């Protein structure tokens, strides 16, 4: 089919080029680079965030291939999850069927963008041949003591009707549903991520290719603190152990606070108090809530003073942190201050700031440095010295021990849902919890389930959960909880390493860690932390030799758009807002925010691709903004990208003399100037690619194309134009691969452009400095000329005659005077 002579028809170009690409990767021999974007949940439609993520990864993969690397660049589907169950309820379709339809739809959409995936490595976590391996891992974890079951207080999402891990609760609400989280006590399965707390912290120091903000977020989430446990005698006779990182503030203590689940509360039997405690449990750990509490009527005895400290149950004290009990020092801790003010408790100041430091203890706690007073043996000491002195004193009394505490808790992996991986154990009245025999894996989900009764369909399935105990053969029941879906995403990067799926130790140890991992920063303390833990757990079980899954992490920014509302305050889609504006209707334009379905500030990728083509969308997504920063969607910007591609196409359409062959060993001085500029841009662009400054690379190849436009206009040597065009097409191919491939074919390029070597900048052209020469006729300036500083004088004179030809006309030249680096003066008769 003839493509040229009728304008840029991106639909025909992209369809043809996509049919010709083949990025299958047979076997693992020679693979020396692994590029991976965080795999998507198959919702049915890709969004602009997907396009940005996967285009960044594609540029890196294509660039690495151009340097001769054999790149593993796979794709898969994070396919378990609640939306599939919700679809089953809403539309009466089985979650497996719904998920497969969505995968098929999104597969077509991703292929339409031109991502160079190894589709032969595609996987879906809902397939038995995937999750049978993680069921086996779980059995390994049980054997190694890394998995256990216990009754504990959990975060219950009343909308999704399931338990959430601490990491999945954001500001007291479910990370997906947004529902207010409730506290319930249930038997749950846990993984002992806390066993690796120090290893996870130490490993952060080795991750030089990770953003500092992500490492800091993980460090804070793990939350290693050095403190002490103090023993307080109490009025009920039970010792109260209190954890504190600030024992030096003990002289300022005016109360003790315990979590609403603390064992000491068994000594309080008042029904009204119990009702208040239930209310405290509901909002425990919610920093947005007022500091609420209930007076137990119990007292603790201050270990150093004749002071009784009332004991309160408080919502800001968590049972999972430390001992679940603290002493309150309102003068020097803001949470204690707020609680003391709310409950009319005493405030004792013990640290006094230096002269000139402004503070108001009536309004807030003072947490700065200063000198101790009202503190007996600490009086006159500074804060650091006082801490050591207090610990030594308490240790000598025998009521104190030093401890290391972590904010990190074991990972609760039980979910009360159907559409997840079954946990491979059974419950037997005689034998207790019994692991399923490995030869019986996978434990598959039943296909016929009833979603109409609410709750977990596996709980009330008539046959699936009823089995024989593998140990004693008596009647038993399967575990009906399924794995948290983060279980699947914590090891999928290892599954891609093997053509057969699962984990092949030899393949994984060869290909891991992933060289470039691309995804959103919102996964810093969920997926990224769990994946690091999983590597360590699998190493302990003998499956892997590596501890860190990702060598370089690129956290792409969000795609943002203005938020629109109508006069009634209802959200509007951008296209509806523009129509209303054209019709003269009132539209409120709000701030620019992350694209969100709930606020309707979304742009449908399929609509934009249909209108402008994949290369236009790719180019816009990668222009102007660094990958790690948010990008604001702009219709004007998309139009600009489209116009650039049209102009590029016309250049080749109108100049059939452009070819892929060239010899620029001996070119004119002025032409050499252009070629030098191209090679200098190539050097800078290659450096940008190495450091993932993709927006800078785009700017340089656009500057390079402007130089080519100028060359054609000015009649530069065809050999120089050809070399420049070959460089231009090769460096733009990772970004806009469809049009680059077609233009490469247009100039007679050999083979597929995506298989061509990345060009190297010529050193002889990089070191050449340019100078501007004034061209005069009879002493009067008529033009200027850019030449290499080392250019031969005769060559410069010849070029000067060309640029002065119009001024000279028919005049006869008598002499030409050349002052190197400055001027050429042409004298006529």
Swiss-Prot record:
EC number: 6.1.1.4
Subcellular location, record wording: Cytoplasm
Disulphide linkage map: none
Gene Ontology MF terms in the entry: aminoacyl-tRNA deacylase activity; ATP binding; leucine-tRNA ligase activity
GO cellular component: cytosol
Motif 'KMSKS' region positions after renumbering to this chain: 594-598
Substrates-to-products reaction catalysed: tRNA(Leu) + L-leucine + ATP = L-leucyl-tRNA(Leu) + AMP + diphosphate
Keyword Protein biosynthesis: yes
Residues where ATP binds: 597
Ranges spanned by the short sequence motif 'HIGH' region, renumbered to the chain: 40-50
A biological process from GO: leucyl-tRNA aminoacylation
Principal location listed in the UniProt entry: cytoplasm
Keywords of the record: Aminoacyl-tRNA synthetase, ATP-binding, Cytoplasm, Ligase, Nucleotide-binding, Protein biosynthesis
Domain of life: Bacteria
Keyword Ribonucleoprotein: no
Family the entry assigns: Belongs to the class-I aminoacyl-tRNA synthetase family.
Protein name: Leucine--tRNA ligase
Organism: Anaplasma marginale (strain St. Maries)
Gene assigned in the entry: leuS
């Amino acid at each position: 089919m003839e493509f040229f002579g009728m304008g840029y028809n991106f639909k025909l170009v992209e369809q043809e080029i996509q049919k010709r690409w083949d990025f299958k990767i047979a076997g693992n021999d020679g693979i020396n680079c692994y590029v991976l974007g965080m795999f998507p949940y198959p919702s049915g439609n890709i969004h602009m965030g997907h396009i940005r993520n996967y285009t960044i990864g594609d540029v890196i993969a294509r660039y690495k291939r151009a340097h001769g690397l054999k790149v593993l660049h796979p794709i898969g589907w994070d396919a378990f999850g609640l939306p599939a169950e919700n679809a089953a309820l809403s539309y009466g379709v089985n979650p497996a069927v719904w998920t497969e339809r969505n995968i098929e739809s999104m597969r077509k959409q991703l292929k339409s963008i031109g991502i160079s995936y190894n589709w032969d490595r595609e996987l879906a976590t809902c397939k038995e041949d995937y999750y049978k391996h993680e069921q086996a891992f779980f059995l390994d974890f049980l054997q190694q003591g890394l998995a256990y079951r216990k009754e504990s207080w959990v975060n219950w999402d009343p909308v999704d009707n399931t338990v959430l891990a601490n990491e999945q609760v954001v500001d007291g609400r479910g990370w997906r549903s947004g529902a207010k989280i409730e506290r319930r006590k249930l038997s749950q399965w846990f993984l002992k991520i806390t066993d690796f707390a120090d290893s996870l912290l130490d490993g952060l120091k080795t991750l030089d290719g990770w953003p500092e903000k992500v490492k800091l977020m993980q460090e804070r989430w793990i939350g290693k603190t050095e403190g002490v446990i103090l023993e307080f005698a109490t009025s009920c006779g039970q010792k109260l152990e209190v954890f504190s990182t600030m024992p030096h503030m003990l002289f300022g203590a005016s109360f003790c606070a315990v979590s609403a689940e603390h064992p000491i509360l068994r000594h309080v039997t008042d029904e009204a108090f119990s009702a208040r405690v239930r209310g405290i449990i509901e909002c425990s750990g919610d920093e947005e809530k007022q500091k609420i509490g209930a007076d137990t009527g119990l007292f603790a005895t201050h270990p150093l003073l004749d002071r009784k400290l009332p004991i309160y149950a408080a919502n800001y004290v968590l049972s999972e942190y430390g001992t679940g009990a603290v002493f309150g020092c309102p003068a020097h801790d803001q949470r204690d201050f707020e609680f003391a003010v709310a409950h009319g408790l005493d405030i004792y100041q013990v640290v006094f700031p230096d002269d000139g430091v402004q503070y108001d203890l009536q309004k807030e706690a003072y947490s700065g440095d200063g000198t101790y007073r009202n503190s007996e043996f600490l009086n006159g000491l500074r804060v650091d010295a006082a801490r050591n002195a207090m610990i030594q004193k308490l240790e000598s009394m025998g009521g104190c021990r030093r401890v290391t505490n972590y904010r990190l808790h074991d990972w609760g992996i039980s979910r009360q849902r159907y559409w997840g991986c079954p946990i491979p154990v059974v419950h037997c009245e005689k034998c207790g919890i019994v692991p399923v025999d490995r030869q019986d894996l996978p434990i598959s989900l039943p296909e016929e389930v009833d979603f109409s009764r609410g709750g977990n369909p596996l709980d009330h399935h008539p046959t699936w959960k009823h089995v024989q105990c593998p140990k004693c053969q008596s009647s038993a029941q399967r575990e009906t909880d399924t794995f948290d879906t983060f279980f699947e995403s914590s090891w999928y990067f290892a599954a891609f390493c093997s053509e057969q799926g699962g984990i092949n130790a030899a393949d994984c140890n060869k290909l891991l860690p992933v060289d470039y991992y691309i995804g959103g920063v919102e996964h810093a303390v969920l997926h990224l932390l769990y994946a690091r833990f999983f590597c360590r757990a699998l190493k302990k079980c003998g499956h892997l030799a590596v501890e860190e899954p990702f060598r370089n992490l690129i956290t792409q920014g969000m795609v943002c758009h203005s938020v629109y509302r109508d006069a009634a305050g209802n959200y509007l889609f951008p296209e509806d807002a523009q129509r209303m504006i054209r019709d003269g209707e009132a539209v409120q334009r709000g701030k620019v925010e992350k694209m969100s379905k709930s606020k309707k500030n979304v742009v449908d990728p399929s609509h934009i691709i249909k209108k402008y083509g994949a290369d236009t969308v790719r180019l816009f997504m990668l222009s102007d903004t660094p990958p790690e920063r948010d990008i604001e969607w702009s219709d004007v910007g998309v139009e600009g990208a489209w116009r650039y591609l049209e102009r590029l196409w016309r250049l080749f359409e109108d100049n059939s003399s452009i070819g892929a062959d060239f010899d620029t060993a001996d070119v004119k001085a002025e032409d050499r100037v252009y070629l030098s500029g191209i090679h200098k841009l190539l050097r800078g662009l290659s450096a940008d690619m190495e450091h993932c400054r993709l927006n800078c690379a785009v700017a340089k190849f656009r500057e390079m194309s402007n130089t080519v436009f100028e060359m054609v206009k000015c009649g530069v040597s065809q050999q120089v134009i050809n070399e420049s065009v070959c460089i231009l097409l090769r460096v733009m191919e990772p970004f806009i691969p469809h049009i680059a491939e077609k233009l490469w074919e247009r100039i007679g390029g050999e083979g597929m452009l995506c298989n061509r070597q990345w060009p190297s900048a010529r050193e002889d052209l990089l070191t050449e400095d340019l100078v501007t020469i004034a061209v005069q006729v009879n002493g009067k300036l008529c033009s200027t000329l850019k030449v290499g500083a080392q250019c031969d004088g005769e060559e410069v004179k010849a070029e000067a005659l060309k640029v002065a030809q119009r001024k000279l006309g028919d005049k006869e030249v008598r002499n030409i005077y050349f002052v190197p680096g400055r001027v050429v003066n042409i004298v006529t008769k």
